[in-house]
């Protein structure tokens, strides 16, 4: 039976930062990066980002794929074992924990003293016609990550959603766009009163109620319009915009541990405040799988560091 001291499940900034810290501490972690785990290539959601300008140390920016390749190279350099298999099942009922990879669920499990869960969260999409064509070519799920890139500057933009997050993203985008349309499917927002007032006072934001996007349009290279539908009359028209931002929530990749660890009402792993500890001793959660608020590459990396230090302390207390 194969046994690991620490197993990291994930392939984004949190996973590889945890691996770097553990490997440098000579703990020799094993990282399961997955084979299109949760529908995303190894490297996580960042691999779908064409340009990152807000990760410290890269004044000229770099692509999400480049950043993750560098992180992986660094974790491997210090001794991380990277396994390109997807963990399909875990048993957290007793230590050592047990895990099985995809297509090997009936085989003997691998055991591990500790697990760092860094499986991330995926942005909810609408599945519009044209969405795949213009994803990261005008369509994004993160205004803070992408709002400042050149294709959005001084251009009309749109935000889908009617909650606090949508209001926050619309307000943020007014720093860069010439105008921001909020597309709200119903005749009212569900955002808090204070956020609605903030939107109403911003001259660069126009709220389009009873409006739903039905198609992303462009020249095949960049988005330049949305086909929108009036949800009351069914009438459709084109809205000229160069950016579409989804603010309709994220889905944390917690199905692997559902029923075995405490999750919040949105499905994110609950951690002890100020740490990555969960209610299961030996299981640590890092990155977007436990962060419903910030969801940034740099905050994910920071929590990966925390998880490594928490895991190292846990292991030392076992000895």
UniProtKB/Swiss-Prot annotation:
Q: Does the keyword NADP apply?
A: yes
Listed under catalytic activity are: [thioredoxin]-dithiol + NADP(+) = [thioredoxin]-disulfide + NADPH + H(+)
What biological-process terms (Gene Ontology) are attached? cell redox homeostasis; removal of superoxide radicals
Keywords from the named record: Cytoplasm, Disulfide bond, FAD, Flavoprotein, NADP, Oxidoreductase, Redox-active center
Q: What is its main location?
A: cytoplasm
Say if the entry is tagged with keyword Lyase.
no
Could you tell me which InterPro entries the record lists for this protein?
Answer: FAD/NAD-bd_sf, FAD/NAD-binding_dom, Ferredoxin-NADP_redctase_2, Pyr_nucl-diS_OxRdtase_2_AS, Thioredox_Rdtase
Q: Assembly state and interactors?
A: Homodimer.
User: Could you share any additional remarks the record makes about this protein?
Assistant: The active site is a redox-active disulfide bond.
NCBIfam families according to UniProt: TRX_reduct (TIGR01292)
Give the protein name, as stated in the record: Thioredoxin reductase
Q: Which organism is it from?
A: Eremothecium gossypii (strain ATCC 10895 / CBS 109.51 / FGSC 9923 / NRRL Y-1056)
- Which gene does this sequence derive from? TRR1
């Amino acid at each position: 039976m194969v046994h690991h001291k620490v197993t990291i499940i994930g392939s984004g900034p949190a996973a590889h930062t945890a691996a770097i810290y553990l490997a440098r501490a000579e703990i020799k972690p094993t990282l399961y990066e997955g084979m299109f785990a949760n529908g995303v290539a190894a490297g996580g959601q960042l691999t779908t980002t064409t340009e990152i300008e807000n990760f410290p140390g890269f004044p000229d920016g770099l692509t999400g794929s480049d950043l993750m390749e560098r992180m992986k190279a660094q974790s491997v350099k210090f001794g991380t074992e990277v396994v390109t298999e997807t963990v399909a099942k875990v048993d957290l009922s007793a230590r050592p924990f047990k895990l099985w990879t995809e297509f090997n669920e009936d085989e003997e499990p691998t055991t591990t003293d500790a697990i760092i869960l860094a499986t991330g969260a995926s942005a909810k999409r609408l599945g519009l016609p044209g969405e795949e064509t213009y994803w990261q070519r005008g369509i994004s799920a993160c205004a803070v990550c992408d709002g400042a890139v050149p294709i959005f500057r001084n251009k009309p933009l749109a935000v889908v959603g009617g909650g606090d997050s949508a209001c926050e993203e619309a307000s943020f985008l007014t720093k860069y766009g010439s105008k921001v349309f909020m597309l709200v499917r119903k005749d009212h927002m569900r955002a808090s009163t204070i956020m609605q007032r903030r939107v109403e006072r911003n001259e660069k934001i126009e709220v389009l109620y009873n409006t739903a996007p039905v198609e992303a349009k462009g020249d095949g290279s960049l988005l330049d319009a949305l086909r929108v539908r009036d949800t009351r009359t069914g009438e459709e028209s084109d809205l000229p915009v160069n950016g579409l931002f989804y603010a309709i929530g994220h889905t944390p990749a917690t199905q692997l541990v559902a029923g075995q660890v405490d999750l919040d009402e949105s499905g994110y792993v609950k951690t002890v405040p100020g740490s990555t500890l969960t209610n299961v001793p030996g299981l640590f959660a890092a990155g977007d799988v436990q962060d419903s608020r910030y969801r940034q590459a740099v905050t994910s990396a920071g929590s990966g560091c925390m998880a490594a230090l928490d895991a190292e302390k846990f292991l030392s207390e076992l000895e």
